[in-house]
Amino acid sequence: MKSHIQSLLEQTLESFKQQGIVPADFEARIQVDRTKDKSHGDLATNLAMMLTKVAGKNPRELAQLIIDTLPASAYVAKVEIAGPGFINFFINDSALADQLQNAVNDEHLGIKLPTPQTVVVDYSSPNLAKEMHVGHLRSTIIGDSVVRALEFLGHKVIRQNHVGDWGTQFGMLLAYMEELRAKNGEKAQLELSDLENFYRAAKLRFDESAEFATRARQLVVELQSGDEYCNKLWREFNDISLSHCHEVYARLGVSLTRADVHGESAYNADLEQVVKDLDAQGLLTESNGAKVVFQEAFRNKEGEPLPVIIQKADGGYLYATSDLAAMRYRSNVLKADRVLYFVDLRQALHFQQVFSLAKLAKFVREDMSLEHLGFGTMNGEDGRPFKTRSGGVVKLVDLLEEANVRALELVRSKNPDMDEVTLTEIARVVGISAVKYADLSKNRTSDYIFSFEQMLSFEGNTAPYLLYAYTRVAGIFKRVTDLDLSQAKIVLEHEKEKDLGNKLAQFGEILSRVVDKGQPHVLCAYLYELAGAFSSFYEACPVLAADNDAQKNSRLLLAQLTARTLQKGLNLLGIETLERM
């Protein structure tokens, strides 16, 4: 409905250009918003106020001219001017009912699909050689949710798990294995079964011994140069580490697979060419032995230029080098229209610099959109970054296990007579869903406080509340026998039916915001509001005890659409639904 009103306004603006009311080359981004007060209609635009200056008319006069020029539409019952020149649209109830009727048998719930694009999504991307921790949660689940929404809307999505499988940490592991083998021979291999402790011991040696640190850096260069021994060990480290990652992905219900892994090492053969191409364009400068690029737009507080380091003095490469190679690959080989990076907000400057450099060096097509969709931090209840009681990093698998234990206690307390197998399965879904939803429901760019107590509550905007809301709606159909809605028609008579219908009709525009802005929290808020709208409808409008069969079947269709929308919305967030709680 929103897109329909935008289309009417675009046609009106085009007519204004032809009539000379506004310049022929005038461009405007027409904004249509949902009204907060239903007495002001369903949708509103400030187009008249946007055109005041170029048209040389007062906004109310322009608003009336817009109304007079609008093409006729069966969807619009009436149009009014409000305040200084807002234009309010009242949607025809029968047109809304028709829109909902079309959604009943449509796998996309009546959503008009956009022109498909090829979208590369870079998310999760943990550094290998150690276990995933809570700091990896946000990129992994926010990225996965946006990927699901993109695919649902018909886009071609290429997942890229740009794991950190190259660099100093592998030099440390190689050097440590070298030391252990010198002492223990091939038996040293057994210690790799606990990669986390192996990494911790290597890091301790790196920090304590300058000689060890030098050797580790040398081994990184040898690894990057293709040394056979280093590469064999490196593959073993990677395989063990990736196995840990994919156990976590499976537990989280994340759609990443081994086929999606395209880490830093994938671009190793391209790094030398990146340096040569930048040099050939006269972009490289030598600074303290390193090869760097300075861009005029990037300076520090003192006004000094900030470098993008491309190659270190010892010949090693950095994140910027592999990022540039990846951007070129994603533009020229994968033919991406958009590339989305779900990486911590603290990396904003890095991405601004490399995006700018990639365009400057013509490594990427001009029409390809590079987007850093950064996120804030997950903090403990003290407001500081989430840590263990001893101050250590919380392993993601430990967090999920605690969520499962707490969810099991909660579900058991509410269902003391339920069998253990069912309890365990419900607790698994509730625990994982609670962790994911608590994160996804927060604005991506905000920091948030992690609280098991809040996320496992059945009140408010939480996973348990929405999972229960879905079972409540779906439960209606368990009480109906011989249901046949094939000839049923949606009719919106009661105010609460209209409110629910309006909310259901917004699903498409909500998903557009999720994929355009990378904001799953908008979908979470919508699902919470939809559950509330259904609750109000259910209290005011008897479904199974309706006045007649036509009314009952109409309300059953509204309930069915609500259940499908809740289920699809939760699934797009990567959350399973339950048939009982």
Swiss-Prot record:
Gene3D superfamilies attached to this UniProt entry: Arginyl tRNA synthetase N-terminal domain, HUPs, Isoleucyl-tRNA Synthetase, Domain 1
Catalyzed chemical reaction(s): tRNA(Arg) + L-arginine + ATP = L-arginyl-tRNA(Arg) + AMP + diphosphate
Disulfide linkage: none
Compartments (UniProt record): Cytoplasm
Keywords tagged on the record: Aminoacyl-tRNA synthetase, ATP-binding, Cytoplasm, Ligase, Nucleotide-binding, Protein biosynthesis
Gene Ontology cellular component terms for the protein in this record: cytoplasm
Biological process annotations from GO: arginyl-tRNA aminoacylation
Subunit structure: Monomer.
NCBIfam families, per the entry: argS
Protein name according to UniProt: Arginine--tRNA ligase
Naturally occurring in which organism (per UniProt): Shewanella baltica (strain OS185)
